Every structure is written in C-alpha cells, then in structure tokens.
Design a protein with these regions (language model features):
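ABC transporter TMD-NBD coupling linker
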Residues: 1-32, 72-79, 122-132, 208
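Conserved beta-strand
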Residues: 23-26, 34-45, 50, 76, ...
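Short beta-strand immediately N-terminal to the Walker A/P-loop
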Residues: 50-51, 99
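The feature captures the beta-strand-to-loop junction immediately N-terminal to the Walker
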Residues: 53-55
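ABC-family ATPase nucleotide-binding domain "signature/switch" substructure
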Residues: 62-65, 94-103, 111-114, 128-134, ...
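Helix-to-loop junction immediately C-terminal to a conserved catalytic motif
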Residues: 68
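Conserved ABC transporter NBD signature motif
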Residues: 76-83, 93
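C-terminal boundary and immediately downstream tail of ABC-type ATPase nucleotide-binding domains
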Residues: 244-259
Length: 259
C-alpha cells in the first residue's frame, strides 16, 4: 500500500537498480523548521542487510521514508545507481522499493488476495516461498483453506505476530531490489525472529534490505549498522567493529540498552 509522495510523478524513467543507493548531504526539515536529518552521507550497496538504529526521535523512520519517495529531502541528493531521484517519477521509484510498515494494513479477504495486492503477477509458488521466508506458513498450514483462508476485517482472526509475518510476506512477494521493513521483529517470539532474520540475510543476497530495528538480536546480524542520533549519522559499521571502538556512540547505546 503506497503513501502519497511529494516527488514529481512525471519525470525521467529509472533504470533497474543494480549497484547501490547513495545519499549525499541529505537533510530533512518539517515546514515548521524542525530539523530531523542533517547532512547524511551514505552508500548502501545491494546485497546487504542494513539496520537503522538509534534512540527515539533520531530520524530513523524519516531516513527510511526517503527511499520510496514518501518524502523528499530539504537539501542534498538521493541516487539509485547515480540516477537522481529528484528527476525520477515516483511510480518508477516504487517499482524499485517495497516498504513494509509497522502498522499492519491487511485486506479483509483471503491470504492469497493480500499477497496479490502487492504483486498481481505472483505465482502460487512465489507466494508460498514468501510466506515460508516470513515464517507465515507455520500458521497458514493450520487453516483448513490454507493460503485461501479469509482473515477477516483488518486480519482480526490473526494474532499481532501473525499479521506481522503476513505483512512481511507481502513485502517479499514484490521482489523489488530494495526492501525496507519498519520493526519487522517487534511482535515475534525469539524462534520466529531468528528464522526471519536468517531469511532476510538470504533475501539480501541480491537486494538491499533495510530494517529499522530496536532488538539487539536483530541488529547484530546486519552487515551494516547505521547509528543515528539527533538526525546525524554517528557510526557506520557492523556490530563487532562498532563494539570494538571504546568511544563509539553505538557501543554506548548498546551498553545503555543492556543496563
């Protein structure tokens, strides 16, 4: 389900992204002047699982919203394979990026219909594979009608964790080069979380997978951690390398989380 975007809808076409996303001196401020992101410079290669980490209000979701073009930078440039998104139509951007929201936006139809909403051309095999990767087959197989089971208004026959897994499966079935997930493991038990993180690592072998994460068990598995604080990138690296730096902001954050 797409949000409206501030980006132009009629612009140059976008080539299929094959290499990386680049953010150059990117800042974002609300109309009232509140600065959320300040001079962000990042290169995010395809093939990596990237975790965006930081305290509440650090700008994590704002940074993630820039990738599918839900908002546009107040300053700076975002490029997909050196193509400036400022000159790219929002429909072309959305062909490259899937965003899975923390809120579960489900149709009161069947599981199959919910998956087809994301990718009307998806085959049965693709849908089942997406459900398997997201850990959703565990509960889908318990329903008499399987993937054709109707889940009720807003998915009210499902638990919060089941809704989350189905939302993730819907994101996976689009098979876009960039997949962004907001708190994908928040409502999952440790076993399901471990399985999903492993699936995301496998999914990232050909895609850029970006997760906004709070759980250390998810964060430490990322190939690259971006630690945000007060709208600025304080640290970039993997868990081991950042924890090895005595003065890193990420290390201090982790130590506070662990008490």
């Amino acid at each position: 389900i797409d949000y409206t975007s501030e980006l132009d809808t009629e612009s140059d076409p976008l080539l299929i992204i094959e290499k990386s996303v680049e953010l150059e001196n990117v800042s974002f401020a609300y109309p009232d002047g509140r600065q959320v992101l300040k001079d962000v410079n990042l290169t995010l290669p395809l093939g990596e699982l990237v975790a965006i980490v930081g305290p509440t209000g650090a700008g994590k979701t704002t940074l993630a919203y820039l990738l599918p073009g839900y908002i546009k930078p107040s300053a700076g440039r975002i490029r997909f394979d050196n193509i400036d998104l400022a000159h790219t139509g929002v429909n072309e951007i959305r062909k490259q990026v899937t965003y899975v929201f923390q809120e579960h936006m489900l149709l009161s139809e069947s599981i199959r219909d919910n998956l087809l909403l994301a990718n009307p051309q998806a085959t049965g095999e693709q849908m089942l594979e997406a459900c398997r990767l997201a850990g959703a087959m565990e509960f889908i197989e318990q329903f008499p009608d399987g993937i054709d089971s109707v889940i009720g208004k807003g998915g009210d026959t499902l638990s919060v964790g089941q809704k989350q897994r189905l939302s993730i499966a819907r994101g996976l079935v689009r098979e876009t080069p960039i997949l962004v997930l907001d708190e994908p493991t928040a409502a999952l038990d440790p076993k399901t979380e471990n399985s999903l993180v492993e699936a995301l690592r496998n999914t990232a072998q050909g895609r850029l997978v970006v997760v906004i994460a709070h759980r250390l068990s998810t964060i430490r598995e990322a190939d690259r951690i971006i630690f945000l604080e007060e709208g600025q990138v304080r640290d970039v690296g993997n868990h081991a390398s950042l924890m090895a730096q005595p003065t890193s902001a990420y290390r201090k954050f982790v130590e506070l989380q662990n008490g």
